């Protein structure tokens, strides 16, 4: 599996959070595509 994106934490700037969430969505897509 690809590495899970690092959670930037509660006090991270909004652009870091946005980057994290898009990376997380991409990560989940990769995993679910492999599983099914």
UniProtKB/Swiss-Prot annotation:
Keyword Secreted attributed: yes
Residues with Tyrosine amide modification: 36
Pfam families from the UniProt entry: Hormone_3
Keywords annotated in UniProt: Amidation, Hormone, Secreted
GO cellular component terms, A-Z: extracellular space
GO MF terms, alphabetically ordered: neuropeptide hormone activity; neuropeptide Y receptor binding
CDD domains from the UniProt entry: PAH
Coiled coil: none
InterPro entries referenced in this protein's UniProt entry, alphabetically: Pancreatic_hormone-like, Pancreatic_hormone-like_CS
Gene Ontology BP terms: feeding behavior; neuropeptide signaling pathway
Compartments in which it is found: Secreted
Keyword set includes Protein biosynthesis: no
Family, as annotated: Belongs to the NPY family.
Function: Elicits an increase in arterial blood pressure.
Protein's name in the database: Peptide YY-like
Lineage summary: Eukaryota, Metazoa, Chordata, Craniata, Vertebrata
């Amino acid at each position: 599996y690809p590495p899970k994106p690092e959670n930037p934490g509660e006090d991270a700037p909004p652009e870091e959070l946005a980057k994290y969430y898009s990376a997380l969505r991409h990560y989940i897509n990769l995993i679910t595509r492999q599983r099914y």
